Amino acid sequence: MDLSADHVEEVQNVLNAMQKILECPICLELIKEPVSTKCDHIFCKFCMLKLLNQKKGPSQCPLCKNDITKRSLQESTRFSQLVEELLKIIHAFELDTGLQFANSYNFSRKEDNSPEHLKEEVSIIQSMGYRNRAKRLWQSEPENPTLQETSLTVELSNLGIVRSLRTKQQTQSQNKSVYIELGSDSSEDTVNKASYFSVGDHELLEITPQGAKAKTNLNPAEKAACEFSEKDITNTEHHQLSIKDLITTQKHATETHPEKYQGISVSDFHVEPCGTDTHASSLQHENSSLLLTENRLNVEKAEFCNKSKQPVLVKSQQSRWAESKGTCKDRQIPSTEKKIVLNTDPLYRRKELRKQKPACPDSPGDSQDVPWVTLNNSIQKVNDWFSRSDEILTSDDSCDGGSESNNEVAGAVEIPNKVDGYSGSSEKINLMASDPHGTLIHERVHSKPVESNIEDKIFGKTYRRKSSLPNFSHIAEDLILGAFTVEPQITQEQPLTNKLKCKRRGTSGLQPEDFIKKVDLTIVPKTPEKMTEGTDQTEQKCHGMNITSDGHENKTKRDYVQKEQNANPAESLEKESVFRTEAEPISISISNMELELNIHRSKAPKNRLKRKSSTRKIPELELVVSRNPSLPNHTELPIDSSSSNEEMKKKHSSQMPVRQSQKLQLIGDKELTAGAKNNKTYEQINKRLASDAFPELKLTNTPGYFTNCSSKPEEFVHPSLQREENLGTIQVSNSTKDPKDLILREGKALQIERSVESTNISLVPDTDYSTQDSISLLEAKTPEKAKTAPNPCVSLCTATKNLKELIHRDFKDTKNNTEGFQDLLGHDINYVIQETSREMEDSELDTQYLQNTFKASKRQTFALFSNPGNPQKECATVFAHSGSLRDQSPRDPLKCRQKEDSQGKSESKSQHVQAICTTVHFPVADQQDRTPGDDAKCSAKEVTRVCQSSQLRGHKTELVFANKQGVSEKPNLIPSLSPIKSSVKTICKKSPSEKFEEPVTSPEKTLGSESIIQSAVSTISQNNIQESTFKEVSSNSVNEVGSSTNEVGSSVNEVGSSGENIQAEPGRNREPKLRALLGLGLTQPEVYKQSLPVSNCHHPEIKRQGENEDMPQAVKADFSPCLISDNLEQPTGSRHASQVCSETPDNLLNDDEIKENSHFAESDIKERSAVFSESVQKGEFRGSPGPFTHTHLAQGHQRGAGKLESEETVSSEDEELPCFQQLLFGKVTSTLSPSTGCNTVATEGLSKETEGNLESLKSGLNDCSGQVTSAKVSQEHHLNEEARCSGSLFSSQCSAMEDLTTNTNTQDPFLMFERPSKQVYQSESEEVLSDKELVSDDEERETGLEEDSCQEEQSVDSDLGEAVSDHVSETSLSEDGVGLSSQSDILTTQQRDTMQDNLLKLQQEMAELEAVLERHGSQPSHSSASLTADSRGPEHLLNLEQDTSERAILTSEKSRDYSRSQNPESLSADKFPVSLDSSTNKNKEPGMERSSASKFQLSYNRWYMHSSRSLQDRNCPSQKEPINVADMEEQQLAKREAQDLMGSFLPRQDQEGTPYLKSGISLFSHEPESDPSEDRAAEPAHVHSMPPSASALKLSQFRVEESTKNPAAAHIANTTRCNLREESMSKEKPEVISSTERSKKRLSMVASGLTPKELMLVQKFARKHHVTLTNLITEETTHVIMKTDPEFVCERTLKYFLGIAGGKWVVSYFWVTQSIKEGKMLDEHDFEVRGDVVNGRNHQGPKRARESRDKKIFKGLEICCYGPFTNMPTDQLEWMVQLCGASVVKEPSSFTPDQGTHPVVVVQPDAWTEDAGFHVIGQMCEAPVVTREWVLDSVALYQCQELDTYLVP
């Protein structure tokens, strides 16, 4: 049409206006599925559902703020017709004018997220930025009708991409390059965009993938130079890829890179959104040009590949180009060349992308964040769709859809390889090569996103065809590939070309078979096929083929074959392949990017897809995968899709496998890092990947092929034969679970691992598909480690893949179990990833996802199974984190190994209960797993080592074996480990001397065994539901913790989180089995304990490592005292994750209880433990009171567990404990002393690690550390628990012998410090146990002593008497209902008052007791000497580490207090304020000082609170579920305290009280005031001389003192501060802080200006939080509740004035309503009245008055209130004046001017009936006469106003 520019502009303006009218006010895009609200506003259905789902309760219309509900939404079909017609008009306008519709992005965003928009818009987007980019892309999209055609397919594939788009303009770019990179989601798209936009420079940029991401665009030449060097690394192959990349780049320049080359705008667009990915892509492109020029051979290869790939590539490209009219011509012209180049390029790009991704992991993560959030909805939609269509897609893809899909995949793979060659070509190719299915999945997933954008119809269309299955496979494979690529990068540098050629040929040969087999058998054939396929084709197939190696490898190969056959006539195929290629490349590149990047953004999109599971996984992958920045995002989506496919069939199984694969990959990454630990930290590896990004990428790709090629041969050649068998079996089951994903993972992992094996060792093949596989993985890692840094990378990839495969295999073996396991693994991965990436975001998402997954996977079988697997995964996760820090690498390998072993064993475990015990101990788990089926294979490798010994020994040997494998790793990694700060560092340290023993025990066992133990305990201790919830919470909190303490605490946190996950899931299934196991064999207890000791020892060793590495050896050597180890490890587990922490004690408790046949306590403890972990995590993460209550309940249970544990220890390990202690602390002469040292060391080691974590958390989240603190609490709690458990063990020993008990108590001070948090829990559980203890006084005393040792630290928290009463009442309460979580509700106000009175009596008794104890304590000093010696024995360690440990413990206590405060907050206002105060103080105080001071303060507060009913209430609820439990207990305690039972109960009660740290601190406060050593000495002596209870109390006090003092010795300043704090706390007892005061003395409130309804709410609030509500304000009143407006402005009332004058909290009624809403007493600071209607709306008078009580505004004034006053009695006015510091005079004649005071007469003139009255007064007394307003204004503002204004005339 010949339209004048003006006319066109007019039409465009009209269309723009129409579009604006038809766009959704929320997303500002054209309304997709219009829904109308009651208020007649139109929104997108998706936007409204998102809005409605965000809030609980009614949501508001964004436009008119009217309430809207889901029911009120009505679909508006007519409006949707309008939108459709508008889009048609716009499209026609674009076609007619050839102009992009400026605002077409609005509809394109949703509908036209097609590549054409991306392509056309790419250059614009490049220059304009992501948002503009997206718009321009969309604008350009409509211009190309063909593009829109592809757009539908693209949109289908873009559905996954759409998330990216929403997240960032990633989707837009993806859409632009959708044709080429449909497979890549947001992150890959971003990469592609980046690389494409820099396509002009991309040749040069490509050269600098490592650190030149940012520089890429700036220095093309430089980058080219760098790229050349990189290319030199992978010369031949890299050049091949380079040529391909160049040609592809040119093609993409036309197609996808409008920015770089207008034709390539799409790819460019893809690359751009990723920022870093952009650079990486650009680097790739540059590299490809350089490579092109450099390597003609590569071009030849590429041509050869083109012959196989060209048809698909050309077809897909041609179809894309045909579809995208504008780009079509450019593309078609270079079609042949480009095809060839693309074929070469994909390989090149794949490698390049790999390099590039490592190069740009940082920015992709950054960019991921936004896309992640924006993509959330899209991903969710896609996930749902996947869930619905997964099974269909899976079967479709595997069967009929297989050939077509595979062809498409091949096309998609090849084309995307070419396109992605720029942005994610490396990644995509790698992903494709490793995951052909993944490519298809990606394609489909992407298609889904596009469809989502376009509409549900499009959604359905594309999805059916290829997104779901390929995406899932692709995701899994991407993960595998990500790790895998790293590995092949190294291994295949030289063989890459040859292998690529071989693979190319093999692919064509094997394509059909693979295609057909793709589900189960494809892996084996795929590997050879890939090998046989051309080098370039193989490289291409590294995308498609490796992807096919899963399920789609065959498809891809067939596709390639078909493409080869139909090079010219393949246009129809081309279209298919183009479509697939578009989707696949995107998915591949995205997957690769996700894999490699593991960045938040990539996490985010996939997280959405995977519901956060991928998010966490990706962070794990991030460590290894940081090279592929874009990939992780897409990988997440595809993985999610992949898992969704399988998951659709197996609900969580699929997602779990995906997660597992991610986790596995992370593990693999870590293993890789371990393998590459040759002084190459993960960072170094990343750098090398960045610098050698292309060569390594090539290597990675080649190994992908190579692995595929050698996978089968190596399988046969190596012990991998066994693994091959496993592989086959697992393949089948895996395919069943996630046909493509599993196959992809397995095949890929196998192939890669085999290639690695062939290159490195045959161990890798073993790790592919079985327990052996997992072991092999570890083994492979070892050789790889021995090899060069590149080999470690390969090893990492292999390990990752192996882990994935293992997981998949495990899934298959126990499909139900597998699902749970996968879920757990996914959780672990997700949570680790989250830690690595945006932990808050991810953790939140992960929590939801975990909840969903765990809800879905409640089968005990796979729970059990997943438990072992999860520990592995946990280890893997931890190690993945370590992976980034090479220093953690040693642990990683061990953990990975064990993880894999555990996974393999996990399968067995599902079969055998014995496996549960195995789960308890990783080595055992490995052994047991092998025992069932993999035993033969395992025995070949590890079983021989592990199986040789009994289960106990098996644990040890297994650990040793794993260690042996990892030993080679460890030595190399020891230096690297040091960078890992606390957790890894410690491992490293012990690694030198105890590397063989300890690394296995401590790293592997600590992480793996611990997780397993934790999970086993979790099963026992936690209910399934609780566990799943807890898992979510735990992973969240852990994730948060991990994020803040990424380096130091990340591994620990990750371990804890994954352990928690494991525990949670296994807990469900495992509870029965675990119980059976625990009951089954306390042989297993030994194993169990052994595993615990290993873990525990590991931690103590870690602690000692810095101090002595001999200790860890001793610990390991002293496996016989497994109990101590066990106890230590259990705390370690707890430390790792609060869930683990609580679970570990529960486990012990369960064991002991089983021994004691105390199922009540056991189950209760279990539940509570689960609740605790759950709540701790939740509370930590969310700061929710309920979770905290659960936490405390769990804590209480843990206490019980600890106690039971001690009892068990008494029964089974009294002698062993000393041995263990001696072994640990050989230097210490007394066994108790050594045990103390051991405990302390362990605690300290944990503390150190935890401290790092806590400190990092503190620094990052000091006051918002509700979550972090909780995490700290959980960590610290774990530490404390470890200490407590060890103490418990020791105390058990003490139970056996009082001497030991005394010594234990003596020891406990160390432990006590760490235990405080733990002991709180312990004392609670011990309260539960106390019922048992009460059974016999002797036993009670012993247990009390044990508990003393464990809980005397707690006694620090509570006075002895209080502790006793607490214990007694708590015990009775536990008997009545340990789970009396609602007891506070049950108790009436009268009862509470009675309890409070009892508390007061108790306080007095406690004070007396304290005095007696102090006297006794000062007398005996020999015990203190021994105690001091003991303390000092470990103190040398402690001195170095106790400071950290104290800090960590204090921090933990602080955080625990904080959590407690939160929980108590909800439970009781009294409790909350103190807790809040202490937590606030803790947070405020830096380092140990803060934590210790806060801890002491808290301890004191708690003690005081304990004494004062409210204190106990607060603490009990926090410690125990119900405050009322504490109240009732206190009542009972008060009664019992009167009795002498107090003495016998004192230890236990003290322990129980200790959790509060009340009596302990109170006593402790006094004792610290006195000479610490003297007090300490006195107390120990007293322990002997006094009754057990009294001595226990004294001991606990002493211990608190001692622990404080030992740290004081180590860190005098800190201890001094703590002591000073404690002293000041004890001195300040009455007025600790307003909040403390509130807790200490019951809160008292008055309300002013409220309606009767509101008053009822206040009454309800007061009842809930044990607050006294009165009608009149009194001296005791603490809070004045004012009716205010939303700005906290109130009317002035008498209570308002009196509240301000009295310095009370004058808070808004909103404080009550919000506190009720959130279920806890909120901080008043946020609700304090700011002003009033008279004196100003923000004068801050109440705050000023409250904060300056010492500065009285009327000080020095004599005021006479004369005459009548209205609205208030004169005496009230006089009281007000008195409160403000004035002296009141009744008559003006009574003024005393000589006193230096200033007289003032206050009158109210309008109240006088006679005029003359008040005028004479001033003359009579010569004092100024002012109106009452002067007083009121001065009080309201709390500033003495000038009298002149108020003088009476």
Swiss-Prot record:
<dbReference type="GO" id="GO:0070531">
    <property type="term" value="C:BRCA1-A complex"/>
</dbReference>
<keyword id="KW-0007">Acetylation</keyword>
<feature type="compositionally biased region" description="Polar residues">
    <location>
        <begin position="1370"/>
        <end position="1389"/>
    </location>
</feature>
<feature type="region of interest" description="Disordered">
    <location>
        <begin position="1562"/>
        <end position="1590"/>
    </location>
</feature>
<dbReference type="GO" id="GO:0045717">
    <property type="term" value="P:negative regulation of fatty acid biosynthetic process"/>
</dbReference>
<keyword id="KW-0863">Zinc-finger</keyword>
<keyword id="KW-0444">Lipid biosynthesis</keyword>
<feature type="cross-link" description="Glycyl lysine isopeptide (Lys-Gly) (interchain with G-Cter in SUMO2)">
    <location>
        <position position="1073"/>
    </location>
</feature>
<feature type="region of interest" description="Disordered">
    <location>
        <begin position="1036"/>
        <end position="1070"/>
    </location>
</feature>
<feature type="compositionally biased region" description="Polar residues">
    <location>
        <begin position="1418"/>
        <end position="1429"/>
    </location>
</feature>
<comment type="subunit">
    <text>Heterodimer with BARD1. Part of the BRCA1-associated genome surveillance complex (BASC), which contains BRCA1, MSH2, MSH6, MLH1, ATM, BLM, PMS2 and the MRE11-RAD50-NBN protein (MRN) complex. This association could be a dynamic process changing throughout the cell cycle and within subnuclear domains. Component of the BRCA1-A complex, at least composed of BRCA1, BARD1, UIMC1/RAP80, ABRAXAS1, BRCC3/BRCC36, BABAM2 and BABAM1/NBA1. Interacts (via the BRCT domains) with ABRAXAS1 (phosphorylated form); this is important for recruitment to sites of DNA damage.</text>
</comment>
<feature type="zinc finger region" description="RING-type">
    <location>
        <begin position="24"/>
        <end position="65"/>
    </location>
</feature>
<feature type="region of interest" description="Disordered">
    <location>
        <begin position="620"/>
        <end position="662"/>
    </location>
</feature>
<keyword id="KW-0862">Zinc</keyword>
<dbReference type="InterPro" id="IPR001841">
    <property type="entry name" value="Znf_RING"/>
</dbReference>
<feature type="compositionally biased region" description="Basic and acidic residues">
    <location>
        <begin position="888"/>
        <end position="910"/>
    </location>
</feature>
<feature type="modified residue" description="Phosphoserine">
    <location>
        <position position="398"/>
    </location>
</feature>
<feature type="domain" description="BRCT 1">
    <location>
        <begin position="1642"/>
        <end position="1729"/>
    </location>
</feature>
<keyword id="KW-0963">Cytoplasm</keyword>
<dbReference type="GO" id="GO:0051865">
    <property type="term" value="P:protein autoubiquitination"/>
</dbReference>
<dbReference type="GO" id="GO:0000724">
    <property type="term" value="P:double-strand break repair via homologous recombination"/>
</dbReference>
<feature type="modified residue" description="Phosphoserine">
    <location>
        <position position="395"/>
    </location>
</feature>
<keyword id="KW-0158">Chromosome</keyword>
<dbReference type="GO" id="GO:0031436">
    <property type="term" value="C:BRCA1-BARD1 complex"/>
</dbReference>
<keyword id="KW-0275">Fatty acid biosynthesis</keyword>
<feature type="cross-link" description="Glycyl lysine isopeptide (Lys-Gly) (interchain with G-Cter in SUMO2)">
    <location>
        <position position="517"/>
    </location>
</feature>
<dbReference type="InterPro" id="IPR025994">
    <property type="entry name" value="BRCA1_serine_dom"/>
</dbReference>
<dbReference type="GO" id="GO:0007549">
    <property type="term" value="P:sex-chromosome dosage compensation"/>
</dbReference>
<dbReference type="InterPro" id="IPR036420">
    <property type="entry name" value="BRCT_dom_sf"/>
</dbReference>
<feature type="modified residue" description="Phosphoserine">
    <location>
        <position position="1002"/>
    </location>
</feature>
<dbReference type="GO" id="GO:0045944">
    <property type="term" value="P:positive regulation of transcription by RNA polymerase II"/>
</dbReference>
<feature type="modified residue" description="Phosphoserine">
    <location>
        <position position="1323"/>
    </location>
</feature>
<comment type="function">
    <text>E3 ubiquitin-protein ligase that specifically mediates the formation of 'Lys-6'-linked polyubiquitin chains and plays a central role in DNA repair by facilitating cellular responses to DNA damage. It is unclear whether it also mediates the formation of other types of polyubiquitin chains. The BRCA1-BARD1 heterodimer coordinates a diverse range of cellular pathways such as DNA damage repair, ubiquitination and transcriptional regulation to maintain genomic stability. Regulates centrosomal microtubule nucleation.</text>
</comment>
<keyword id="KW-0808">Transferase</keyword>
<dbReference type="GO" id="GO:0003677">
    <property type="term" value="F:DNA binding"/>
</dbReference>
<feature type="region of interest" description="Disordered">
    <location>
        <begin position="1621"/>
        <end position="1640"/>
    </location>
</feature>
<dbReference type="GO" id="GO:0043009">
    <property type="term" value="P:chordate embryonic development"/>
</dbReference>
<keyword id="KW-0227">DNA damage</keyword>
<feature type="modified residue" description="Phosphoserine">
    <location>
        <position position="434"/>
    </location>
</feature>
<dbReference type="InterPro" id="IPR031099">
    <property type="entry name" value="BRCA1-associated"/>
</dbReference>
<feature type="domain" description="BRCT 2">
    <location>
        <begin position="1749"/>
        <end position="1848"/>
    </location>
</feature>
<dbReference type="GO" id="GO:0006633">
    <property type="term" value="P:fatty acid biosynthetic process"/>
</dbReference>
